[in-house]
Amino acid sequence: MLKKVSFMVDFVNFKRYNKQTFEKRWDGSVLNIVLVEPEIPQNCGNIARTCAATGSRLHLVKPLGFDISDRAVKRAGLDYWHLVEVSTYENLADLFEQHPEAAADCWLATTKAPQDYCEAEFHDGCWLFFGKETAGLPEDFRLTHYERCIRLPMRAEARSLNLSNSVAILTYEALKQLGFPGLKGTGEMAEQPD
């Protein structure tokens, strides 16, 4: 179950506050969403909102194509920023140095993948990597993790899906496989009229 916490992001310095409380918020699984060199602030904001709604952690690998304090980022994330744990890294090596476990249970979203995402088996705490909007993930990174590359099926004429849409699709597929831990599964509607 979701527990209320006080957690805020200082958009200027991008510091994390009250991390211990944040980590106690979920009793279930947590996904790690990694954006490698994202370029479009609105996508980052939308993805932050998806992370807030699902209890996923957001990891941003520099260089970023925007300032994290950009109004477009904040606006797209609405008032959900207090629900998101966000970390930044200088590069992929920095991320793997801080989180060596990421290499063991990662999935790389790429249009060049040999398998579609339905073949992936997602686990508690797995890491989902997404590349920048114009070029995707670096080729050497994809080749190193070739067996962990997955693709969202689409028409041959389409180059790719929007980054924030791709993140949402894979995040919810992973959570579906895990049984939607910690998420509210039903809404409350007015009674159906006779």
Tell me the role of every PLM-derived stretch.
Residues L2, S6-D194:
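Post-transcriptional modification and biogenesis factors for structured RNAs
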